[in-house]
Amino acid sequence: MSWQTYVDEHLMCDVGDGQGHHLAAAAIFGHDGSVWAQSANFPQFKGQEFANIMKDFDEPGHLAPTGLFLAGAKYMVIQGEPGAVIRGKKGAGGITIKKTGQSCVFGIYEEPVTPGQCNMVVERLGDYLIEQDL
């Protein structure tokens, strides 16, 4: 299965609410910031944004004072799982990032998708990739 298939079929899928809602954007990146696959509308990282996200996995709490930035948009960092999951909120939407052995799985949501639905979609794929040593 190609990495793009994981994004298209496992991240940009129906979130399971029975109403056909899905994430606004999703991507899988290598730990070095290389794009493995992404939805067409996934925002592009600027400057040190990706490096700062990776630093927060290594030093949990690093992003809390400044926020998480993606393409210049600021997300307030909310409770995640230190070293494993970063969650952010921006207005009625937000972001979930799950770190695996070799990659980071990103999901961005907007209403009516809920934070919990985004977490479930992103973390389910992330857990699968961890089981596959990816």
UniProtKB/Swiss-Prot annotation:
Main location: cytoplasm
Name of this chain's protein: Profilin
Subcellular location: Cytoplasm, Cytoskeleton
UniProt record similarity statement: Belongs to the profilin family.
CC annotations in GO: cytoplasm; cytoskeleton
The protein's assembly and partners: Occurs in many kinds of cells as a complex with monomeric actin in a 1:1 ratio.
Species name: Brassica napus (Rape)
Gene3D superfamilies, per database record: Dynein light chain 2a, cytoplasmic
InterPro entries reported in the protein's UniProt record: PFN (IPR048278), PFN_euk (IPR005455), PFN_sf (IPR036140), Profilin_CS (IPR027310)
CDD domains for this protein: PROF
Keywords attached to this entry: Actin-binding, Cytoplasm, Cytoskeleton
GO molecular function, one term: actin binding
Function: Binds to actin and affects the structure of the cytoskeleton. At high concentrations, profilin prevents the polymerization of actin, whereas it enhances it at low concentrations. By binding to PIP2, it inhibits the formation of IP3 and DG.
UniProt keyword Cytoplasm, yes or no: yes
